[in-house]
């Protein structure tokens, strides 16, 4: 999956939208997303507000400040657990499958993802993601988060993120 997902992110000219229930990116994935955002692309990340793994939720949130500073717009979906795994690049590239955006899916698990280079499929995926974004809350940059309640658990989870 990283070989499948990296080129569309690097080649995108207008937008990169990523939807994943488990967001625990490695350095290359973080660099791809932040570079795209710093390059002026519309980069959006949609994750569940609460995952079925609290440790994964903390690990994901530990990366938010870095991504927000680069210009990535992050949304937390709340009505229910989000299980969608999709990447949309520009108006013609869409990847869907079983792979989460985490090291475990990229390196350990047997995952299947399919890349579509088709404007109709990409338009349909953009509509589906757009509907989910309307039901999500955009994350705001918050430097003054409580140490014990959020920053410390996030830092601990980030240390474990290569294992998640």
Please state what every model-predicted region is:
Residues 1-4:
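Active-site cores of enzymes that catalyze phosphoryl transfer or operate on phosphate-rich substrates
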Residues 12-18, 22-164:
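PLD/PLD-like phosphodiesterase catalytic module centered on the HKD motif
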């Amino acid at each position: 999956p990283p070989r499948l997902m990296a080129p569309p992110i690097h080649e995108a000219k207008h937008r990169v939208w990523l939807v994943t229930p488990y967001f625990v990116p490695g350095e290359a994935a973080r660099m791809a997303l932040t570079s795209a955002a710093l390059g002026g692309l519309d980069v959006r990340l949609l994750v569940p507000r609460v995952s079925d793994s609290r440790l994964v939720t903390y690990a994901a949130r530990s990366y938010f400040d870095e991504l927000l500073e680069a210009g990535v717009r992050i949304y937390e979906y709340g009505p229910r657990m989000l299980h969608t795994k999709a990447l949309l690049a520009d108006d013609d590239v869409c990847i869907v499958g079983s792979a989460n955006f985490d090291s475990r899916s990229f390196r350990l698990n047997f995952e299947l993802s399919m890349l579509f280079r088709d404007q109709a499929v990409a338009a349909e995926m953009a509509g589906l993601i757009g509907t989910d974004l309307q039901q999500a809350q955009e994350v705001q940059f918050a430097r003054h988060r409580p140490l014990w309640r959020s920053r410390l658990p996030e830092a601990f989870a980030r240390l474990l993120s290569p294992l998640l």
